[in-house]
């Protein structure tokens, strides 16, 4: 009997809410055993696992030990030294901190490098485009400098010699010189920045990797989506997520470990692969995230799992492996039936859809499960798909004022005295359809309140003055 109780207690059952640990990962300090985002000088992104004693390779930028960056705040920039060591610096392009520099041969900042040659020009009209001939330093010379050692000042030495060998550098404007210097620093300096891997940063990573995987969604659109959906701690939401779990991760961040998210999917198992970077405890994920397939959602009465409960005597007679299998099947049946009961109960605090499904055919089954005055938010990368859904909502009358929203953040290049947008940027972002769930009155509307009582008296027609004088005569 004791072994039966022990096997049953070892199952993955949902613990009590009060006994659950909240978010254990650090959002401010670089801590071990969690994921982080590396931002390279070339503006590339890399996700790393901060395992103590591990070694991270950044390709041409070098290799470093994980222990050297632990304990620093997120957002700290490092420079790779010899023997897998790193030192903290201010930024990708700024000079290293005096307290963290061990040698006196400090690198030059962009202002110091700009002053190496003569004064800059007021404009670029004196520059003659002769291609690569304007640079005396050849690619073979650069390769020799790279092979001379893996020290931290090799990149700075290459940049200095490239500026000294550039015949037209003094003919550039000061702003053009700084842009040239920044490009070379991004290419040759062995630096990187460690950032916290939140949902926004994870979306940036997938945008650089494959925009179709996140359905062309931008960061500002993700923020607008969560804002219109009114995602908050303690809520109960219905979600369709075809981005691999990025929307689910963003919702869990906002909900701070409190609430429930029912994720509807069309496969045997949901695709939440992005949650592996969230570093949330498994117990927290199991408690907050509930999955249900569309067959269970549309036909809940027929899809409930019927489980035959065995008696204690029958359980005692089972072998250890069969007993564990029995408890797993029992727990699975309870989990599925509890999610189906939750959907049948309805009254969700909001509905979010980020998918390629045809929503006009699916909304009639989803809208009844949404609570009154709750938001219905649908994202699509194509506006035409949302126009059809908006027309369907307008005729349904169970969703109030469906509106299509669009947001764009355009980066600008700032120059002293003038400012203009960056010439090249991605044309993605997507569109959001937002409405409010309402309950229309089935019968006619009855007016309430006092009326005016009396109709306005008509003013007598004014008789022309000439006609009145003739009548008096």
From Swiss-Prot:
It is found in: Nucleus. Keywords: Nucleus, RNA-binding, tRNA processing. Pfam families: Gcd10p. GO terms for biological process: tRNA methylation. GO terms for cellular component: nucleus; tRNA (m1A) methyltransferase complex. Signal peptide: none annotated. Residues 1-25, 445-473 are annotated as: Disordered. One of its GO terms (molecular function) is RNA binding. PANTHER family: TRANSLATION INITIATION FACTOR EIF3-RELATED, TRNA (ADENINE(58)-N(1))-METHYLTRANSFERASE NON-CATALYTIC SUBUNIT TRM6. Heterotetramer; composed of two copies of TRM6 and two copies of TRM61. Belongs to the TRM6/GCD10 family. Substrate-binding subunit of tRNA (adenine-N(1)-)-methyltransferase, which catalyzes the formation of N(1)-methyladenine at position 58 (m1A58) in initiator methionyl-tRNA. This is tRNA (adenine(58)-N(1))-methyltransferase non-catalytic subunit TRM6. It comes from Debaryomyces hansenii (strain ATCC 36239 / CBS 767 / BCRC 21394 / JCM 1990 / NBRC 0083 / IGC 2968). The lineage of its organism: Eukaryota, Fungi, Dikarya, Ascomycota, Saccharomycotina.
